[in-house]
Amino acid sequence: MQNRNTYEWAKKMTRLISVLVMIHIITRTSISNAYPIFAQQGYENPREATGRIVCANCHLAKKPVDIEVPQSVLPNTVFEAVVKIPYDMQMKQVLANGKKGALNVGAVLILPEGFELAPPDRISPEIRQKTGNLYFQNYRPNKKNIIVIGPVPGQKYSELVFPILSPDPSTDKEAHFLKYPIYVGGNRGRGQIYPDGSKSNNTVYSASATGRVSKILRKEKGGYEITIDNTSDGGQVVDIVPPGPELLISEGELIKVDQPLTNNPNLGGFGQGDAEIVLQDPLRVKGLLLFLASVILAQIFLVLKKKQFEKVQLAEMNL
């Protein structure tokens, strides 16, 4: 009897573990397709040697993105880097379950070495209000200059404000008073490719063979099974279309290999941009201010001297 109870307990535990594993897999798949988590998992550096940001591997459509930073900053100061990801707020994308929903956005900000996310105690109330409830994180624990955010609701955060702390060359010997490049990548909407290379339901599906569409079966949970009578070998090919894309073909139609079976439901896309920022030497700024002050004083003295000379000339003429 005891052995039987032990067996039943082990059986229940096995089922529970199986359910938890399945939940983990489903959740992981959903998250990994959400920019920019996938890039963190699959790439040591999000920017390739060619300058291309790897997020474009999953988000195939090209869309604009913009970044605004100050022209120059002083050492050890907090400033804003504003990333703008514009899109039509009325658009609804295809979700993983095939239904329509709002678009999310995400971004990766690649700063020069030494620049990093500002600690909470250094962020002013004004900047804190602009950042809202956003949760920023480093791309890697050892890469504090690369910051990622998302996915977050695009209707609320199409403009992302990153609070950035500039380095101090007096304490950081790797930092220098120079002009530096800043790179940004930003997307709106879901990707078209999953981490394992398979397609998401947010892309176009094409025929895998040439032939006649003999059957289109609408699946109970959405999506289609399309049977194609292959003209090359006389066999049949079944193409699976997940929920989301809309069919463009019908039964009895002759189609060719790679011909689109569905529309392309993707409304989002990825873009990248860059900007430049100067880490300004405070002594140079003070020197410039002193120079400007000396020029202004020289102009004032020149005007006074000129007026004094005119008075002397006028007095001599009266004599």
UniProtKB/Swiss-Prot annotation:
List of residues binding heme: Y35, C55, C58, H59
Function: Component of the cytochrome b6-f complex, which mediates electron transfer between photosystem II (PSII) and photosystem I (PSI), cyclic electron flow around PSI, and state transitions.
Membrane topology (UniProt): Single-pass membrane protein
Protein's name according to its UniProt entry: Cytochrome f
Keyword Chloroplast in record: yes
GO CC annotation: chloroplast thylakoid membrane
Cofactor comment text: Binds 1 heme group covalently.
Keywords: Chloroplast, Electron transport, Heme, Iron, Membrane, Metal-binding, Photosynthesis, Plastid, Signal, Thylakoid, Transmembrane, Transmembrane helix, Transport
Keyword match Heme: yes
Quaternary structure note: The 4 large subunits of the cytochrome b6-f complex are cytochrome b6, subunit IV (17 kDa polypeptide, petD), cytochrome f and the Rieske protein, while the 4 small subunits are PetG, PetL, PetM and PetN. The complex functions as a dimer.
BP term (GO), one: photosynthesis
MF (Gene Ontology): electron transfer activity; heme binding; iron ion binding
Family label: Belongs to the cytochrome f family.
Signal peptide start-end: 1-34
Lineage top rank: taxon: Eukaryota
Known cofactor(s): heme
Annotated TM spans: 287-304
Principal subcellular localisation of the protein: plastid
Location within or outside the cell: Plastid, Chloroplast thylakoid membrane
